[in-house]
Amino acid sequence: MANKLGGVIKLIGISEKFKEGIYTAVKPVIISKNSILSRVENEFNSIIIEGDSIGEIAFYGKGAGKLPTASAIYADIINIINNKKEKGLLFNDEKAVIFREFPKEKDWFIRISTEYRTEVICDINKLFKKVYVYSKNCFSKKEIFAIVYNEKEKDLKNKLDSIPNIKKLKTTIILFHS
């Protein structure tokens, strides 16, 4: 389905600073095929940083993979928690507010596996102001694909949770990055 939308699904680490706090997560994202991230394959990694004055810059290279990467990330997290880096230069004693859900409105791709397609499609259409449900040419009669536009992640999850028996259904939520 991502291909039909002109993109590919990648597991992306996202971090964004807001006045009120920081959002950080690793989640599946539909990336445009025109993005440099869409061409990163196998053991290679890429980081894109966007700054106010420099715009967007990208770093690309081979990752360490598996255990070396995991242990390096773990060590970095422990150092940050223990504040062992140079105090004042990169870190200070200020406590950061961490958002578990993306605090701004975004577009989301949803995939739901259900025996009750018609009922769930009706619920989705009632719950969201702007939604597009793909009902034709789907891969399976038991799956629903939809794009929900302009929703905060927390609101999206709460609305989906209000669908009867949603906890029993296999639901995948993917950030749609244009």
What positions do the PLM features span?
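Active-site lining segments that contact anionic ligands and/or coordinate catalytic metals
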Residues: 21-23, 44-46, 54, 105-109, ...
